[in-house]
């Protein structure tokens, strides 16, 4: 067939152009590798372009050389950023020499003088650097008074600005430590009108606290006064040293209590919110605030303090009082929160002068004895020996053995335990004026019931904060549960038996030993632990029965001749006939003449002066001879203790 007459047929295949376009769209957008000759140099978006020579030079450098090069670049950047960079480097080199311990005083003095000469006119700028501020601190520590005056002159105009700086604050504290009375007064005057803002600042508060700590009573009052009222902040000299509290100041100046309350609230609230509560001036401010605060404001502040914040305050006099007030006026839930926050911190608190009083307050108030036993008592049991021998550590133990004793607690300590918030205390008295019995047999007030019903409907979480001071349990029952039922008393007696001689001769341990030996106040240990107490009497008598140490043994002293132990044993003879009988039979019978002089004579005279007839008759035969001879002297007016 011929193909001439045939028409050309259309191709049924897809066009190559369509398929090629789709194929190109699926291709990777990453450019293919090309030879070095075909590559074009693209300018970098940032910084100066590197030349080919620089690249070759950097690739040819060793690792050590690259580090040196990077260090040089860093140094160059620091020089541009810091105007006194070279000076700082010079000061650091001098500092490395002057801070050595083996350097002579004259050499150090020369280095310090040179450093101060280099810094002259630039002290405020240098003080804000983390490196050079250390140089300043060392200079202030070892320089002469004339050099301190030079530094202080430069510091004074920039005092407030530097007070809020992270690094300069340490230099300022050193300057305040070495400041004269006039210089300290000038610094405190510079703080006038700025105390409240600085107390809200993390670093500024350190300067205010340091100045408050170093200042006199009048200067402390000056710093505190402007926190009470706007008038006291603006005008100087409105108060004197006679007005020691905010209540006295309000009475003298005729200020409005509500205005003072609002002013103090505005200052205190941000301080508590930021958690800057470590300073004594803040603790004093809070204590003063609670004396004038209304019921709602006082309850709010105490509620904010519950928990970990309170642990940071118990190391000061006013801080520990705030903790006691929080425990007294807090609800059961808040007390539980406070005690749980003390976990693993009880030992440290017990050895602290003021923290130990917080533990004593808990033992006197909190009714949840299971929680107190679990967290506080168990931690105290682990260090009983150290607690007994420590001046502060014995206080919680003595509070359980003999509560609120003026023999062991000072007047200030007893006043702290009796402290309360006036606005919350007045409400407590009105609530307890009419009491009824609830289903558990506990006494509660009718007004308390009404208020509880109202608070549930309106604002229960807030009003729950305000409760009656102290617990509902009988104090004797609470002591029984904490001391005897918990096993603390038994463990304490065992420790006393093991360390009888050491405790008796200790200035502080002998008092705990005495209270344990007599069975505590109200004889709380006697019914259930009488056998254990007899073991203690035997242990003391065994130590007393030991022979006198030889004259060559000057370091050792017999417990009958020791000042502290002889007084303690004498008191036990007068007050515990059972102990007196064991001691006389085991240690003194037939040996009274050899012990009739020195401190031991007071113990022998106690056998004659005791009110117990059996003890007197037991020792009469042997002691009466000594009395008649004049060897043993008995005071005619002396009465049994």
From Swiss-Prot:
Cytoplasm among keywords: no
GO biological process terms on file: embryo development ending in seed dormancy; regulation of translation
Amino acid composition bias (Acidic residues), ranges on this chain: 441-455
InterPro entries attached to this UniProt entry: ARM-like, ARM-type_fold, CPL_dom, PUM-HD, PUM3, Pumilio_RNA-bd_rpt
CC per GO annotation: nucleolus
Subcellular location, principal: nucleus
Descriptive protein name: Pumilio homolog 24
Organism lineage string: Eukaryota, Viridiplantae, Streptophyta, Embryophyta, Tracheophyta
Annotated gene: APUM24
């Amino acid at each position: 067939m011929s193909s001439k007459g045939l028409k050309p047929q259309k191709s049924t295949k897809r066009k190559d152009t369509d398929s090629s376009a789709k194929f190109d769209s699926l291709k990777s957008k990453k450019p293919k590798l090309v030879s070095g000759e075909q590559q074009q140099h693209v300018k970098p978006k940032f910084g100066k372009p590197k030349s080919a020579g620089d690249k070759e030079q950097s690739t040819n450098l060793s690792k050590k050389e690259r580090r040196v090069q990077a260090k040089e670049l860093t140094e160059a950047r620091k020089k541009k950023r810091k105007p006194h960079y070279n000076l700082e480097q010079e000061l650091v080199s001098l500092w490395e020499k002057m801070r050595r311990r083996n350097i002579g005083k004259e050499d150090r003095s020369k280095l310090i003088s040179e450093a101060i000469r280099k810094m002259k006119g630039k002290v405020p700028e240098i003080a804000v650097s983390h490196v050079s501020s250390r140089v300043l601190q060392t200079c202030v520590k070892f320089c002469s008074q004339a050099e301190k005056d030079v530094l202080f002159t430069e510091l004074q105009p920039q005092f407030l600005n530097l007070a809020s700086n992270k690094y300069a604050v340490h230099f300022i504290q050193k300057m305040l430590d070495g400041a004269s009375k006039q210089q300290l007064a000038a610094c405190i005057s510079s703080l006038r009108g700025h105390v409240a803002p600085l107390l809200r600042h993390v670093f500024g508060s350190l300067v205010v606290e340091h100045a408050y700590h170093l200042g006199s009573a009048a200067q402390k009052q000056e710093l505190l006064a402007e926190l009470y009222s706007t008038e006291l902040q603006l005008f100087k000299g409105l108060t004197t040293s006679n007005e020691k509290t905010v209540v006295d100041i309000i009475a003298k100046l005729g200020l409005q209590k509500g205005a003072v309350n609002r002013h103090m609230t505005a200052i205190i609230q941000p301080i508590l919110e930021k958690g800057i509560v470590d300073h004594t001036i803040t603790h004093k401010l809070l204590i003063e605030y609670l004396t004038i605060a209304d019921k709602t404001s006082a309850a709010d502040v105490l509620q904010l303090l519950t928990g970990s914040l309170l642990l940071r305050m118990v190391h000061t006099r006013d801080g520990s009082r705030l903790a006691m007030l929080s425990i007294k006026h807090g609800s059961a839930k808040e007390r539980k929160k406070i005690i749980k926050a003390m976990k693993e911190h009880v030992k440290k608190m017990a050895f602290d002068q003021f923290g130990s009083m917080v533990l004593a307050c808990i033992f006197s108030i909190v009714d949840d004895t299971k929680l107190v036993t679990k967290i506080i008592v168990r931690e105290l049991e682990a260090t009983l020996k150290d607690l007994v021998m420590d001046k502060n550590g014995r206080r919680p133990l003595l509070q359980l053995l003999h509560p609120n004793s003026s023999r062991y607690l000072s007047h200030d300590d007893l006043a702290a335990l009796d402290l309360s918030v006036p606005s919350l205390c007045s409400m407590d008295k009105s609530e307890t004026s009419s009491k009824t019995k609830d289903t558990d047999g506990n006494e509660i007030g009718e007004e308390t019931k009404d208020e509880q019903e109202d608070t549930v409907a309106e604002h229960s979480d807030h009003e729950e904060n305000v409760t009656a001071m102290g617990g509902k349990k009988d104090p004797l029952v609470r002591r029984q549960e904490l001391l005897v039922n918990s096993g603390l008393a038994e463990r304490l007696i065992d420790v006393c038996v093991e360390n009888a001689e050491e405790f008796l001769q200790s200035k502080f341990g002998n008092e705990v030993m005495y209270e344990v030996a007599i069975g505590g106040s109200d004889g709380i240990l006697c019914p259930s632990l009488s056998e254990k107490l007899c073991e203690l009497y035997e242990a003391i008598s065994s130590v007393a029965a030991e022979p006198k140490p030889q004259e060559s043994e000057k370091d050792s002293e017999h417990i009958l001749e020791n000042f502290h132990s002889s007084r303690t044993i004498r008191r036990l003879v007068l007050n515990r006939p059972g102990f007196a009988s064991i001691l006389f039979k085991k240690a003194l019978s037939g040996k009274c003449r050899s012990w009739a002089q020195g401190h031991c004579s007071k113990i022998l005279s106690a056998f004659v002066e005791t009110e117990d007839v059996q003890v007197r008759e037991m020792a009469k035969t042997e002691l009466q001879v000594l009395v008649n001879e004049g060897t043993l002297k008995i005071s005619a007016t002396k009465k049994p203790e």
